């Protein structure tokens, strides 16, 4: 582990919760501190640093964006301030293919959005039942049709060199419909991989299986996350 190998640098995963929810989800419902070591033991992925920020303070639906009026700057906090903190204070591998995002539900949107908007930092996104069109549950922090956070536009016009992995149940209509609408807009070098399960709805069972599957996919698709002998 991290403390046992002070000479070693590690890839990084930024993990985002849903709303309503809390960062505790990644200890209780999706215990990445147990899931990753089990995958390391199975030689499917290497050890990684996981950073779990609060992106919905007091369940305020920020959608991880910078608001139009400047009152909320969650995008800047995560992609600039928190990234800089992690690089300065943790033994990270400083290259985009060693940085991934992970999120479920609204956190899945954050994962896809932050990776598409900041390919200089994040090379991979793992979205569990997320979506690709911004949707505020409460006050809208950005105007309708805002091009800054239009992921379809970014994927088709800018085509950042990132890999997106999307997992959902077919009977979870909002995420399923969202990825169907987004997929045709993706062009190279952006890559979208969609993994579907037949049923399960918007649930922890789906996301638990998806976390396992997504991390294995990450280990298979990034040399920086691929398993290496200790």
Predicted segments with their positions:
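Non-catalytic cap/lid and distal C-terminal segments of serine-dependent acyl enzymes
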Residues: 1-230
């Amino acid at each position: 582990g991290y403390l046992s190998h002070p000479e070693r640098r590690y890839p990084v995963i930024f993990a985002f919760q849903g709303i309503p929810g809390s960062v505790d989800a990644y200890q209780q419902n999706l215990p990445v501190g147990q899931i990753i070591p089990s995958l390391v033991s199975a030689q499917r992925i290497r050890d990684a640093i996981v950073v779990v920020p609060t992106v919905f303070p007091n369940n305020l639906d920020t959608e991880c964006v910078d608001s139009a009026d400047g009152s909320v700057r969650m995008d800047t906090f995560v992609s600039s301030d928190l990234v800089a903190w992690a690089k300065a204070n943790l033994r990270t591998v400083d290259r985009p293919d060693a940085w991934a995002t992970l999120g479920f539900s609204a956190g899945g949107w954050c994962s896809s959005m932050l990776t598409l908007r900041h390919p200089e930092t994040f090379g991979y996104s793992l979205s569990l039942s997320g979506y690709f069109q911004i949707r505020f549950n409460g006050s809208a922090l950005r105007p309708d049709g805002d091009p800054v956070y239009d992921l379809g536009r970014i994927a088709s016009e800018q085509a950042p060199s990132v890999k997106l992995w999307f997992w959902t149940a077919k009977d979870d209509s909002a995420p399923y419909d969202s990825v169907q609408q987004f997929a045709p807009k993706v062009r190279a070098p952006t890559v979208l991989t969609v993994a579907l399960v037949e049923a399960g709805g918007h649930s922890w069972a789906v996301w638990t299986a998806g976390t396992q599957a997504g991390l294995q996919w990450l280990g298979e698709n990034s040399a920086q996350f691929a398993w290496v002998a200790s």
